[in-house]
């Protein structure tokens, strides 16, 4: 059975099944996620607050038809428990990744975009040498942990970012404080069904 994420104005965000592998990834708020030229990053944690940069700045930078995405986490992304990956696998394919960020205007956590049919890595990996994540003005190598085809992905414009992600503490279901969330459990079925 296919379901949709709907915006408040009735636009379709992403068709999913309740049985699809879903990962919500919390990042800092940006307009384009294609570097900092003409854009900036707001929120997203203490590192961003201190340095005005985060590894997610290139999450929607088209690198020969591929997006290389980054979300920070403690330990590793648990692909074995949450996506039934084999124990010797370092990645899992066909995960729908929903990128979310806290709107700086105070209106809450919003969907900013998604990758469908993504590859999710258990640990951070180094980017290919011919990408902005590898060669950039910041003299840093920006690791990534999620990749997807550009054709299977969507970055929402600021005006399209109107779907609120429920807050587990306030709403009794939804995303908590962690940057990675798997939308598991009976209480969270509400979110998959909306």
What does each model-found stretch correspond to?
Residues 1-13:
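N-terminal amphipathic/basic-hydrophobic helices that include classical n-h-c signal peptides
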Residues 10-57, 125-194:
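Contiguous surface segments at macromolecular interaction interfaces
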């Amino acid at each position: 059975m296919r379901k949709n994420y709907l915006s408040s104005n009735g636009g379709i965000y992403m068709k999913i099944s309740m049985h699809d592998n879903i990962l919500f990834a919390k990042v800092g708020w940006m307009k384009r996620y294609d570097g900092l030229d003409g854009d900036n990053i707001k929120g997203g944690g203490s590192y961003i607050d201190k340095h005005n940069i985060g590894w997610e700045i290139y999450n929607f930078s088209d690198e020969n038809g591929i997006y290389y995405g980054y979300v920070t986490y403690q330990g590793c992304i648990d692909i074995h428990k949450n996506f039934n990956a084999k124990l010797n696998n370092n990645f899992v394919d066909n995960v729908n990744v929903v990128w979310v960020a806290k709107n700086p205007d105070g209106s809450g956590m919003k969907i900013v975009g998604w990758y469908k049919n993504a590859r999710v890595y258990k640990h951070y990996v180094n980017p290919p040498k011919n990408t902005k994540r590898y060669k950039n003005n910041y003299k840093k190598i920006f690791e990534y942990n999620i990749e997807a085809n550009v054709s299977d992905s969507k970055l929402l414009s600021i005006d399209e970012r109107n779907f609120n992600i429920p807050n587990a503490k306030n709403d009794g279901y939804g995303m908590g404080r962690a940057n990675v969330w798997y939308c598991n459990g009976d209480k969270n079925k509400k979110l998959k069904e909306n």
